[in-house]
Amino acid sequence: MKILVQKFGGTSVASQEARIAVKDKVQKAVRSGFAPVVVVSAMGRKGEPYATDTLIKVLKETNLSVNVRELDMMMCCGEIMAACV
């Protein structure tokens, strides 16, 4: 079985309709005999609630002394949320 890497950016997972389209593309790859590896970005664009830039801004506004570990954790939150939904 061939591996197919599918990358979906923020707007590709920003809405329920867009996520359904992503699901359909992944399922089509499976039906075509591929083993998909799906990579997703955080949902939306800068300024939207779950976009990486927005999450980092919230962290920096509430904590002026952000350490690297906290920043790394916040930076992956949007992608984790997108992968879950």
Kindly give the residue locations of the regions a language model identified:
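Nucleotide/pyrophosphate-binding catalytic subdomain
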Residues: 1-85
